[in-house]
């Protein structure tokens, strides 16, 4: 009987983490798909903005959670377009964004957003933290939705306490009011 041997105790100790790791696969694949689709959607959005389909009005983006992939990808494509990509986006607000805080990510966005570039974070957003830990290969990368963007000084950082990731759609008005963007 396995339970009566020393190996049984070891097997039982390994079985629980192994079960967790194998069940984490259901999170990983959809998350990678969300990132990929966000990148593609952002590139398409950038192209439509470059084509002038928005008219001659300034654009404001408010992106939360995985929607940040779309906006970040769009802003990156606008940056790659050089001068053509500038003066299209007036403001970009990222709320609980699962993107890196690195200068490589935020500096290009800063260069194409003519007005406010805002990172709204909450260090106690456990849902975002859990999703990040299951899907992030580099544990040294800081996540914008959980911390401040330090290396691009003109990025506004707001720590919104008690931001509930699961209820973000209901929280948007409150967040926009707290960062003085409600119009």
Tell where the protein language model's regions lie, with residue ranges.
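Alpha/beta-hydrolase fold nucleophile elbow
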Residues: 53-64
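Gly/Ala-rich beta-loop-alpha elbow adjacent to hydrolase catalytic centers
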Residues: 63-67, 71
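Active-site signature of alpha/beta-hydrolase-fold catalytic machinery across serine-
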Residues: 73-77
């Amino acid at each position: 009987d396995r339970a009566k041997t020393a190996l049984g105790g070891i097997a039982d100790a390994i079985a629980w983490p192994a079960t967790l790791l194998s069940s984490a696969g259901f999170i990983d694949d959809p998350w990678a798909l969300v990132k990929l689709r966000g990148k593609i959607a952002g590139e398409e959005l950038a192209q439509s903005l470059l084509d002038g389909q928005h008219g001659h009005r300034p654009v404001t983006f408010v992106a939360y959670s995985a929607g940040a992939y779309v906006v970040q990808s769009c802003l990156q494509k606008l940056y790659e377009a050089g001068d053509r990509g500038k003066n299209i986006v007036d403001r970009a607000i990222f709320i609980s964004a699962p993107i890196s805080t690195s200068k490589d990510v935020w500096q290009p966005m800063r260069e194409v957003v003519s007005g406010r570039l805002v990172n709204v974070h909450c260090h106690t957003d456990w849902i975002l933290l859990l999703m990040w830990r299951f899907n992030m290969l580099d544990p040294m990368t800081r996540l914008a939705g959980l911390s401040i963007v330090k290396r691009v000084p003109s990025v506004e950082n707001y720590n919104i306490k008690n931001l509930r990731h699961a209820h973000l759609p209901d929280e948007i008005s409150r967040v926009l009011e707290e960062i003085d963007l409600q119009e």
